[in-house]
Regions:
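Polybasic "coupling" helices that flank or enter modular domains
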Residues: 97-98, 115-180
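Glycine- and acidic-residue-biased ligand/ion/polar-headgroup-sensing regions
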Residues: 33, 44-57, 72-74
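Phosphate-/nucleic-acid-contacting segments
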Residues: 147, 156-219
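Short alpha-helix-to-loop micro-motif enriched in aromatics/charged/Gly
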Residues: 61-68
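Cyclic-nucleotide recognition modules
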Residues: 69-125
Length: 219
């Protein structure tokens, strides 16, 4: 499918706006592990994912990563165009978790259209509100939910994304997602293994008891 099929506001644009986007649209293929945007880069623009998977995260003062949210096929990333939204005051990094094909609408192009189009402005505000809701939910999890529940939730989410209970993922990667230390995650996973919830092997975690993990995350 083409960009027009992926961009939800295409039919709300006038002919001139459609031409402006088409003339300036950037198509990009990025490899797994590529940093697409970080707080020190210029305003990248609006990202629309054709296929693949991105992770948006922040860095603590100690250099620890914590995932804000992940993006999948047909998702739109606004934080990569933070310069057009004055309310965004924090720096984020966006990384490709898988090989990803995406489109980029340059920030100035999108900003101009947003000023002239009420549907685009409304959609942008709604999407930003959704993302901030995701971030507030994450903060609530960090503050009030114990680490064992957060690890259980992460493993179940990862299994759902990958479509398998055999997860090719390192303890360091989980720590980066959850804003923790690798050693702490390793101890928790070893505890899970002792309880028969998972099986650990080099570079892989196999979920053995999804139902008990679900019970744990809800408790």
């Amino acid at each position: 499918m083409s960009f027009e099929n992926y961009f939800p506001l295409w039919n709300d644009l006038n002919t001139a706006q459609k031409k402006l986007i088409s003339d300036n649209l950037i198509t990009q293929h990025v490899k797994k592990g590529t940093i697409i945007h970080n707080g020190n880069m210029d305003c990248t623009g609006l990202l629309l994912i054709k296929s693949g998977q991105l992770r948006t995260y922040i860095l603590s003062n100690e250099g620890r990563e914590i995932t804000l949210y992940r993006l999948f096929d047909m998702d739109i990333c606004l934080l990569s165009a933070s310069c057009i939204i004055r309310s965004i005051q924090f720096e984020v990094t966006i990384e490709a978790e898988k090989d990803t094909d995406l489109w980029i609408i340059p920030a100035e192009i999108y900003k101009g259209i947003m000023k002239d189009s009420a549907p685009v402005a409304n959609y942008t505000n709604e999407l930003m509100a959704t993302r901030f809701s995701d971030v507030m939910w994450l903060i609530e999890q960090i503050m009030w939910k114990s680490l064992d529940k957060r690890v259980a939730s992460f493993l179940l989410e990862e299994a759902s994304i990958e479509g398998t209970n055999e997860l090719k993922i390192t303890h360091e990667t989980i720590a980066n997602h959850l804003g923790s230390h690798r050693e702490v995650i390793t101890r928790m996973l070893r505890y899970f293994q002792g309880e028969g919830l998972v099986k650990l092997s080099r570079g892989k975690i196999t979920i053995l008891d999804s139902k008990r993990l679900e019970t744990l995350q809800r408790s």
